[in-house]
Amino acid sequence: MPHLDQKLPMRWRIPSRLWAWVGILALLWLGLASPVAARIDPYVNQYLRVSGPVELPLDAAGHTLTFTPEQLTDGKNRFQSACLNCHVGGATLPAPNISLSLKDLRGATPPRDTLQALMEYQRDPRSYDGSDSSYGCRPVPPSWMDDEAVNYPAPTAKRYGAGFQ
């Protein structure tokens, strides 16, 4: 059986091969690009305004950590499963006048405006003025979540709070 190009006039032989290569490249591009895009939650792009790596303050000394949109998506998912019951829409149900805004996080005693401070708070929740244990927020002991698991929601909450300065 003759090849398809042998039936076509000479001027059509190159374009048919070109279209075949364009089709193959398009399929490869779609196959490689879509899994990456699927891992980033649209919420992270739209509301946290993250499309690439972002630096967030780690501690009071000014050290920072860099997070990818994928890491923030994972943090958002963990926040939804562990924190959303009390922090719907950035509010704090036990104390509605205190939100997750950076202004409110900075005003806490001790301040909770760095990743390290938020992670410490998750291990030992204190009242806003730091005087007593917070009965509205349950502590997250290492037996429930290891340090890595506890650390994931903090960057998402921190980035969320940055939108409400």
From Swiss-Prot:
Keyword entries, A-Z: Electron transport, Heme, Iron, Membrane, Metal-binding, Photosynthesis, Photosystem II, Signal, Thylakoid, Transport
Cell location: Cellular thylakoid membrane
InterPro entries found in the cross-reference section: Cyt_c-like_dom, Cyt_c-like_dom_sf, Cytochrom_C550
Cleaved signal peptide residues: 1-38
SUPFAM superfamilies: Cytochrome c
Cofactor(s), by name: heme c
Molecular function per GO: electron transfer activity; heme binding; metal ion binding
Protein name, as recorded: Cytochrome c-550-like protein
